[in-house]
From Swiss-Prot:
PROSITE patterns: CBM2 (PS51173). Its EC number is 1.14.99.54. SMART domains: CBD_II. Cu cation binds at H35, H144. One of its GO terms (cellular component) is extracellular region. Pathway: Glycan metabolism; cellulose degradation. It comes from the Bacteria. This is Lytic cellulose monooxygenase. Its main location: secreted. The lineage of its organism: Bacteria, Bacillati, Actinomycetota, Actinomycetes, Kitasatosporales.
Length: 364
């Protein structure tokens, strides 16, 4: 009972987060890239995003390591927590990804994840029991076939030392594991059982490399854990030690239900440029299906104090509850398989440039 009062179970944390989890962004236009990172045990980017998420669209991490990473890498990386990727890795690891950069995809990602390489002992962590079997959950925002290589740091590794390939030993490789939930939907994930080595205690790190078999693109994930008899509890994030509250409820809940993933359509959000009192943003609409997407619409609620101005390559409407819905225009109505289109907008803002809760595809 004492242990349960000190820890938050990851399942409870995920249930609270995923009800209001914001979709993050992917730069560019044309080919749709995959997304994915470890959710159990939670990666640094996943748990820091959970810790930082608020009900206003602002990021306010309570964990000092997450705060430092946000200061170093900015909001773009944290909102894009499931895109620690290298488009050209092709299964390469040691000798290709430099030591000290494993948690940022060798600094080859389109996004700046350098801050998540920091060698420090105060990252959010998952509490595990040596010799037990856990179920790994790995986000499937864009599902693709391939292998998941799972590594564990060797005994004696310290979280305050740089993470290198010599610190790791491969403990499992899983090919095409099953999935729960839809790709591109809140909570959707791959899952499989992982037998943890016996005789371990203290701090460790689980490193995963997702090697796609249909592309050269690979994903990288660093999950801080401690072998102390735990059962998947998470500490070091907002609400630790009591009832989990990673995402405070907005003072005025929206009357319009949050958007849901629509078929193979996925929407990803980007702040292109910002200035005092406003910003320029874009939304990429991605088709992860095998058939053309004929017509699309995207819905979100802007951050508190944010008002959309002009919109191009899309047709906007505004709800009475503050939500925004943008539909296709004639020239970008059809999105080809594994393709994407992008619309842009300007907005006035008091600093909350990102959406409150989820942005997603809805019926046109």
């Amino acid at each position: 009972m004492a242990r349960r009062s000190r820890y938050i179970s990851l399942a409870a944390v995920m249930a609270t987060l995923l009800s209001a989890l914001g979709v993050t962004f992917l730069l560019g236009q044309g080919r749709a890239e995959a997304h994915g990172v470890a959710m159990m045990p939670g990666s640094r980017t996943y748990l820091c995003q959970l810790d930082a998420k608020t009900g206003t669209g602002a990021l306010d991490p309570t964990n000092p390591a997450c705060r430092s990473a946000l200061d170093t890498s900015g909001a773009t990386a944290l909102y894009n927590w499931f895109a620690v990727l290298d488009s050209n890795a092709g299964g390469r690891g040691a000798g290709y990804v430099p030591d000290g950069t494993l948690c940022s995809a060798g600094n080859r990602s389109p996004y700046d994840f350098r801050g998540y390489n920091a060698a420090r002992s105060d990252w959010p962590r998952t509490h595990l029991t040596s010799g037990s079997t856990i179920q790994v959950n790995y986000s499937n925002w864009a599902a693709h076939p391939g292998d998941f290589r799972v590594y564990l740091t060797k005994p004696g590794w310290s979280p305050t030392s740089e993470l290198g390939w010599d610190d790791l030993e491969l403990i499992e490789t899983v090919t095409d594991p099953p999935q729960r939930g839809s790709a591109g939907a809140d909570g959707g994930h791959y899952y499989w059982d992982l037998a943890l080595p016996s005789g371990r205690s203290g701090d460790a790190l689980i490193f995963m490399q997702w090697v796609r078999s249909d592309s050269q693109e690979n994903f990288f994930s660093c999950s801080d854990v401690v072998f102390d008899g735990g059962n998947g509890e998470v500490t070091g994030i907002r609400g630790s030690g009591g009832t989990p509250t990673p995402t405070p409820t907005p003072t005025t809940p929206p009357t319009t239900p949050p958007p849901t993933h629509s078929g193979s359509c996925m929407a990803v959000y980007n702040v292109e440029n910002s200035w005092s009192g406003g910003f320029q943003g874009s939304v990429e609409v991605m088709n992860h299906g095998t058939e053309p997407l004929n017509g699309w619409a995207v819905q979100w609620k802007p951050g508190n104090g944010t008002t959309l101005g002009g919109v191009w390559n899309g047709s906007p409407t505004r709800g009475t509850d503050g939500t925004v819905k943008v539909r296709n225009v004639d020239h970008n109505r059809v999105v080809p398989p594994d393709g994407s289109v992008t619309f842009g907008f300007t907005a006035t803002s008091t600093g909350n440039d990102f959406p409150v809760g989820t942005i997603g595809c809805v019926a046109p």
